[in-house]
């Protein structure tokens, strides 16, 4: 048997809901009673499943049409300028300059890469300081081991590329640092569409660079005393946690 609903408040809204509920009980339609309240925002189930405790680090402010109420571009959702026109010859020349071998690093497993700060320097040289920026395109999703967020690269007022950055972390105290690493990862991925560091994906260049500037060495891990073979630049010495 359904119980009558009682409200201690005297507001008009409370009285209305109580009368509505009690009326439905009397008519036998209590199971169909609904309020008109709406959720604050909708979240896609797939995104919520990836978020830490079903939550994001930010709330979205994006507009579907990509234009804010003030008439400016909302880069959270807008695709303004993507593929609309090429940059001038001066910019393209700066972007196409070959990488300096001294700028390229190599990981112990043999993967060569360009440090993130070098990408920023190339962008500053091509577009000028303040002539480019990285804008968020999604909320920051935090899983039990990973931080990920989508970013867009905007140069001279037009969207150039969109990429998703990701960064591992090992404890909750490392989440703030991981969000910065995620941003840096997205920047490097976006720069691929501008041709920056394209040599790093060229098998011929990779083989030549490793032959001319790198060498494999047998080293010993200081903590475990295990021996292994690692890659290192010829102009560098073996560093912690390894010893020659």
UniProtKB/Swiss-Prot annotation:
The protein's job, in short, is: Performs an essential function in the repair of oxidatively damaged mtDNA that is required for the maintenance of the mitochondrial genome. Binds to DNA.
Tell me the keywords, alphabetical order. DNA damage, DNA repair, DNA-binding, Mitochondrion, Mitochondrion nucleoid, Transit peptide
- For this entry, the protein name equals Mitochondrial genome maintenance protein MGM101
Q: Does the keyword Cell cycle apply?
A: no
> What's the chief localization of this chain?
mitochondrion
What the record says about family reads:
Belongs to the MGM101 family.
GO annotation, cellular component aspect: mitochondrial chromosome
In this UniProt entry, which cysteines form S-S bonds? none
Keyword hit for DNA-binding: yes
Localized where? Mitochondrion matrix, Mitochondrion nucleoid
Biological process (GO) annotations held by this record are: interstrand cross-link repair; mitochondrial genome maintenance; recombinational repair
Targeting presequence: 1-22
Query: Which GO molecular-function terms appear in the entry?
Result: single-stranded DNA binding
Q: Which organism is it from?
A: Candida glabrata (strain ATCC 2001 / BCRC 20586 / JCM 3761 / NBRC 0622 / NRRL Y-65 / CBS 138)
**Record-linked Pfam families:** Mgm101p (PF06420)
